[in-house]
Structure formats: C-alpha cells, structure tokens
C-alpha cells in the first residue's frame, strides 16, 4: 500500500501529538500523586510476632502472621523510631485510643481491612506507642497484621515494668458503655464507649497495675438483661474461659496470673423481670467463683456490688461469698457493697451509666479498700 507524502507527514504529526499528550498526562498524574500524598513511599513492615511488641490482655496467636482479639481494654505497646507509624487491621466495628509518648494522639475508628495511619510528621526520634481498645467485643474478631514504619526505621525494645495484675470480670460498667455520653438519656454507640476511662482501668492505673477485662454489656450470671426467660443460655460463665468472646478457642490461664480478680456480676440478672430464682442465682454464682479460684489459686478475689436500682441482689451475693468462705475456708475472697453518691446532673453518660467523672468517683472509693486488703 502506497502512502502519499501528505499522509506520511500527517502520521508523523499525529505521532508527535500522541507523545506530547502521554508525557503531559504522566506529568500531571505524578504531580497529583505527589501532592495528594499517595505517591509510593518505601516502608518497613513489622510482623505482629516481633519481640518488641507487648500484648496485655487476651490475644489469639494461633495463626501465622495474624494476632486476633476482641475483648475490651486490650492493649498493644511498643517503641518505634522515626516520624511515621501505621497499623494493619482487619476490623470495621471498633474504636481505639492511640497514645504517642504518653499523650492521647488520636482516636482511631476502623471501617475495613486496611492500613491505618497512627501518627505521621513526628519528630525524628524514638517514640512510645500505646493502643487501647475502647469498645467491647462486636460481631467478629479483630485481626492485627503488624505495623508499617518508614524505610530504615524499626521497633525498639519495650522495657517491661514489673507491675501488679488485676482481672476485671463483669458487665457494661467495666466496658465503659456510654462513658463519653453527654446526658443520661443519650443513646449508646461505639463512639461514646471508652473502656479506658471506666473505673476498672482508672483504678488499675492508680494501683500501678496491668489489667485484663472480661466484660460484656448486659451479661449476667444466670440471666442476661432483656431475656424474657428465667435463665439465659450464654451468660458470663459460658464465655469466661474463651481467648476471644467470638471464638471457641480456650484461653491458657497460665499465661497471665493476676494478683487480684474483681468480679462485678448480678445487676443484670435482677435488672428487670422475670427474675431468676434465688437458688439458681446463688448456685451458679458459687459455681463460677469456684472456677475462678481453681484457675487462679493464689489470687485474691473481690466480689463487688453497688446498688443501681435495688440492692436486694447485693444481699444475695454477700450470702454467696459467706457460704463459699465457710465451705472452703478461703481467706482471700471477700465481698464489698460499694455506695458511691453520683450526681445525676454531672456523673452520668448514656443510658444511666457513669461518665468519666462518675467512674473516677467509683475508682476513688475502691482504691483505699483494695490498698488495705492487698497491703498495696
């Protein structure tokens, strides 16, 4: 096929235009990426099994390259060098406090399986990182896949402090439900729940203790809040020995032996009708406390009750502890009925649950009781 001179030069001109368009498009694209911050930057990935990561609480390490969890208040600690740190999480249901160098840096609200920036543009030096789970167990487990740092940066050894250990077992008062709510009639959601400011963690920090929280809103000993039946199938004794609430893997109790166990259960059993029978309630409560004692042979156990609507259940619980002490001779278990005067206008968040001010008052009332009993 013959090409005329005119067609030949037209083709050359067309080719030149295409090259220019491609060059301009490439330049614009690269510029856009640079200014948007999406341009590729070399990063160092740190696996979750790195020895410089400290885990506090119940975590599932059974899967390679993934650490799973869901209980409220679990903590991940590390030190890192550099200006930037991100976390790989598969999670769309939870919120986390991100502390950098001991100060609250941000609240992370997860939405999907992705890489979340925790901090950037920091001073180029060593930093401490503490992540605390604000929210209680949701629909599924969280999968932690590690950290990303700038290329050349790394995690640094964590100096593990020799702290006391406390385990808190209970309900929404330990999860911090509604603790950041503005009024008692506000509706609970994940954004106003902050386990970190609930009285258990506040108390633990006062006592220089690490803590583990096994708590579920609405949970009971024999009957959960809102159940139309006299008994519920999935109460705290059902979930207690799990590594994660939403998985059946059993927890290895030898991994973490607390000095003190604080149990606050029973309010939900008697929050609304139909009430469980006294025999069923006390029998199951004694059975559960015996399980705790078997798992933690050396720990002290504080069984706590503070009146919410009615305090009759507190008498039932006191009788449980007295019967157990008489039967077994256990001198390291005791009962406390805690009366704290909370101001209805200042000390309550959502759904008649304490806010930060209310939780601080409860922790302040408990601190001298525990210090005296534990000789702390």
Task: Give the positions of each predicted feature.
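Glycoside hydrolase catalytic-domain groove-lining segments
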Residues: 276-301
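Sec-exported extracytoplasmic/periplasmic mature domains
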Residues: 174, 208, 212, 266, ...
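Structural recognition of the beta-strand scaffold that forms the well-ordered cores
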Residues: 165-169, 174, 211-215, 259-264, ...
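N-terminal secretory targeting modules
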Residues: 3-4, 9, 18, 23, ...
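Proline-centered flexible-loop/turn and helix-kink motifs
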Residues: 92, 297-298, 329
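Extracellular serine-dependent O-acyl
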Residues: 301-350, 358-376
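Surface-exposed acidic, glycine-flexible loop patches that form ligand/cofactor-binding
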Residues: 156-159, 248-257, 290-296, 373-376
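Conserved SGNH/GDSL esterase-like catalytic core that processes O-acyl groups on lipids
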Residues: 71-74, 137-141, 179, 185-276, ...
């Amino acid at each position: 096929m013959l090409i005329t001179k005119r067609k030949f030069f037209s083709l050359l001109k067309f080719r030149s235009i295409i090259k220019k368009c491609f060059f301009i498009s490439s330049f614009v694209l690269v510029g856009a990426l640079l200014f948007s911050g999406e341009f590729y930057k070399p990063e160092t990935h740190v696996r979750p099994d790195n020895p410089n990561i400290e885990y506090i609480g119940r975590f599932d390490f059974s899967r390679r390259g993934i650490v799973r969890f869901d209980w409220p208040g679990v903590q991940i600690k590390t030190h890192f060098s550099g200006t930037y740190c991100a976390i790989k999480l598969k999670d769309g249901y939870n919120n986390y406090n991100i502390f950098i160098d001991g100060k609250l840096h941000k609240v992370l609200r997860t939405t999907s399986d992705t890489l979340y920036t925790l901090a950037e543009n920091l001073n180029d030096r060593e930093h401490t990182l503490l992540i605390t789970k604000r929210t209680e167990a949701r629909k599924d487990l969280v999968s932690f896949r590690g950290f990303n740092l700038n290329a050349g940066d790394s995690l640094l050894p964590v100096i593990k402090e020799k702290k006391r250990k406390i385990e808190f077992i209970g309900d929404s008062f330990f999860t911090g439900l509604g603790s950041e709510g503005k009024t008692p009639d506000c509706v609970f959601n994940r954004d106003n729940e902050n386990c970190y400011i609930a009285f258990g963690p506040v108390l633990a920090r006062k006592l220089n203790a690490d803590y583990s929280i096994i708590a579920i809103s609405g949970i009971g000993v024999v009957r959960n809040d809102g159940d139309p039946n006299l008994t519920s199938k999935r109460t705290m004794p059902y979930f207690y020995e799990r590594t994660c609430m939403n998985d059946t893997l059993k927890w290895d109790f030898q991994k973490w032996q607390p000095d003190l166990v604080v149990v606050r259960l029973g309010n939900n059993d008697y929050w609304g009708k139909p009430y469980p029978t006294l025999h069923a309630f006390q029998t199951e409560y004694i059975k559960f406390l015996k399980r705790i004692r078997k798992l933690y042979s050396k720990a002290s156990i504080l069984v706590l009750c503070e009146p919410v609507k009615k305090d009759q259940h507190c008498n039932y619980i006191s009788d449980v502890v007295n019967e157990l002490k008489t039967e077994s001779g256990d001198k390291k278990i005791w009962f406390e009925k805690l009366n704290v005067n909370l101001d209805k206008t200042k000390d309550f968040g959502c759904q008649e649950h304490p806010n930060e001010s209310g939780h601080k008052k409860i922790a302040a009332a408990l601190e001298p009781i525990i210090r005296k009993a534990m000789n702390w």
